[in-house]
Amino acid sequence: RQRQMCIRDRNGTVHIPAAKNSVLPLLAAALLCNGTVRFLQVPHLADVDTSVELLQGAGCTARWQGSDITVQGVPSTCRLAPEAAARMRASILFCAPLLARLGRVETVLPGGCRIGARPIDLHLSGLAQMGVHCREEGERLILTAPAGLHGADITLGFPSVGATETLLLAAAAAQGETVLRGAAREPEISDLAAFLNRCGGCVQGAGTSTIRVQGRRMLYSCSFAPMADRIVASTLACACAAAGGRVELTGCRPETYAPLLEILAQMGCRVETGPESAVITRLGALHGAGRVFTGVYPALATDAAPLLAAAMLAADSASSIEDVVFERRFGCAEGFAAFGAAVQVQGRTLDIRPVRQLQGACARAADLRGGAALVVAALAARGRSRITDTGYIDRGYAGFAQMLAELGAQIEREMPRESASEKKTPSKKQN
C-alpha cells in the first residue's frame, strides 16, 4: 500500500535527533566489539531496522530497548541476509567487520535510492590492498581474506564517505597500520572514529583528508550517543525558509551544515547560531540564491540539495543548483512542477524561475531526500497537498509529520483505506 502525507496549508523549537548517516556505520562497527554495545537515543527509522535485521542475521543479538539499541555477541555467519542487504546501500558497511571476524562474507549488491551511479569500486579496491579477494557471481558478492586483514597505505581517487567508512572499519581490526589518503572529511567519519577509539581503537586524523589507524586485535564494549543529524536540521531550516516563520533547532552543531545556513542568509533569512543551536527566521520576501553547487564536505551536502531547491521555489528571483556528486539527484523536479513551479533539469543542474504562488497538489516521492523536499514545497504551497510513497521518507526521518506539526504545520499522516477485497471477513466462532 502507498503511505501518504496530507498537508493543508512554523514557529517552534525542535531538538535534532541522531544522524541516520552516523547510526548505520556505527551499527556495523558493533560487529567488531566484544561485549554489549549500547547506542543511545537512536531514531526509529526504516534503515536502522534494516541494520538491526542484518546484525541479527549475522548471529548477533541486536534489539531496541526504548530509544536505545543494544548489540551483543560475535557474528556466527558470513552471509548477510539478502533481502535486507538489497534494501539499503549501507549494507556494504557490514562487509569489513565480518571479514575481520570470519575471514569471509557473502552478500548481494547493495540497494538504496535511485539518485545516480553509486559504485562500490573504491570500497573493493581499498579492501584488496588489505588482503581481500573479491569475486562477483551474478548479483552475489563474495569477499574473502584468507590470510586476514593487514594494514596498507591507501589513496582514494575520490573522497567517498562510504569507502572511507568501509576502510576505517577494516583498518580498525587489521594487523598493523593503515593510512587512508584522500579520505572523506564528513563529521559522520569523525563520529565513527570517536566510537572506535572509545572501544579501544587507535584512529587519528578523522575529519582530515589523511587518517591513520593502528589495528587492534580486540575492541571492547561501550555506550555511545551518535551525533545529531545535520540533514534533518537542514530540512527544517529549508522548511522555515520556504513557508516563513521562526524555527529554533537545538542539539546540532551549526558548523556541520554551515554552507546551507549561509545560503539561506543570503536569500533573506535571519540566521542566529550558538554552539549547538541555530535560529532561522523568515518574515519577509525570500530572494533567489543565484547559482549554487554541492560538493564534498565542508561544501554544501549533496543530501541537502533537493531541500534547498524546495526553498528556492518560494523565492522572488531565479536560482539554480548543481549537484556534483550524483547525476540524478533532482528526481523531485516532476513533483515540484505539480505544485506549479517553473523548474527545468539540465544534466546535474536544476534551474528554478520564480512563480507567483505554488499551489497545493498531489506528488509522489521517488527517493528519500527528494520526498522530504516535496513536503517542504507543499508547506509553501496554497491549499491542500498530498505526498504519496512516503515510505522513502521513513528511511531517513522519524516522525516527520509530527515534527513539522510541532512547528505549526497543518500536516497529518494518512493511512490508506482498505478496499472491499482487502477487508477481512470475521471468522466464525468454533464450538
Regions found by a protein language model. Give the residues of each.
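Short, structured segments at the rim of ligand-binding sites
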Residues: 1-4, 8-431
